[in-house]
């Protein structure tokens, strides 16, 4: 039954795509870029943040897009009021469960990648490291990795100065082998260990966003670019709306230097920014039906492992 379900979910995927995935997973350094959609139904999208949207509308801001609205808001008092509302509302959603179906799909995907990287022969120790660049504030990825017993390293604001894991890869002293190591980079900040978000630990969208990144998170942003510019690197983009111009610019520059990018498309109508169109390999939803893209990628990687 499981094989039949997998066949139904990725039956429209071409053999050419499977072979290309087999090639990159066998030798390339793997990185991920996660946006809000990676959490599926486990955590609300911004469109469900009714209190924040109301606070924005009351202050004359367009509540349909917080990124755009605050990027064009020069009034610091308004920005801070919206930020405080957002933080309070965000913390009201912190009681998510790791056994949510969408998070089980994410767990399955991360485990599948760990397995295929572990089994791949002739890998340089550095390629045993899997980079996870996330724009999300939550600790869902970290909690899943830790709960699954997968070796990981988390880079948050407190570790962003002079303590980057460029050369850290796990090693099994019994088997004398390097093991898959996930390095999670929190590009826009993070909740604390208790899932609590505070305004001082996030880079909130706004006019000073680039400045905030440069002052608090610039090393993390530059680390992302450095990793993606390395030879034989592949990036899997999941749940990302392509709304961050700085991140898009990094990806575009890296593609020009040889980066291979796979984008898991959630809906057929979802599109790439013009500079990236034609340079990114799109994996569409089979049959045009939206489904957790983590599930799609997990099944693809598992199938590649059986080829």
Regions found by a protein language model. Give the residues of each.
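Conserved catalytic-core helix/loop/strand module for nucleotide-ribose chemistry
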Residues: 1-229, 234, 240-243, 250-307
């Amino acid at each position: 039954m499981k094989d039949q379900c997998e066949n139904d979910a990725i039956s429209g995927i071409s053999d050419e795509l499977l072979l290309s995935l087999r090639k990159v997973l066998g030798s390339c350094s793997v990185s991920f870029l996660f946006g809000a959609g990676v959490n599926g139904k486990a955590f609300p999208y911004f469109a469900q943040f009714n209190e924040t949207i109301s606070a924005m509308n009351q202050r004359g801001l367009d509540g349909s897009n917080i990124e755009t609205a605050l990027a064009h808001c020069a009034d610091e008092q308004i920005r801070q009021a919206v930020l405080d509302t957002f933080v309070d509302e965000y913390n009201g959603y912190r009681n998510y469960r790791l056994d949510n179906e969408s998070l089980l799909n994410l767990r399955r995907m991360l485990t599948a990648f760990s397995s295929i990287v572990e089994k791949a022969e002739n890998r340089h120790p550095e390629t045993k490291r899997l980079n996870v660049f996330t724009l999300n504030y939550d600790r869902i990825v970290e909690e899943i990795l830790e709960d699954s017993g997968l070796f990981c390293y988390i880079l948050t604001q407190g570790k962003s100065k002079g303590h980057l894991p460029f050369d850290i890869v796990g090693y099994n002293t019994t088997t004398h082998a390097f093991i898959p190591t996930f390095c999670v980079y929190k590009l826009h900040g993070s909740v604390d260990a208790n899932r609590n978000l505070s305004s001082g630990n996030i880079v909130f969208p706004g006019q000073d966003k680039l400045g905030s990144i440069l002052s608090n998170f610039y090393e993390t942003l530059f680390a992302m670019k450095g990793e993606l510019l390395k030879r034989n690197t592949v990036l899997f983009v999941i749940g990302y709306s392509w709304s961050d111009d700085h991140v898009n610019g990094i990806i575009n520059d890296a593609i020009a230097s040889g980066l291979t990018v796979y984008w898991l498309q959630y809906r057929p109508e979802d599109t790439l920014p013009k500079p990236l169109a034609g340079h990114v390999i799109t994996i569409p939803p089979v049959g045009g039906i939206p489904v957790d893209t983590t599930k799609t990628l997990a099944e693809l990687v598992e199938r590649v492992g059986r080829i």
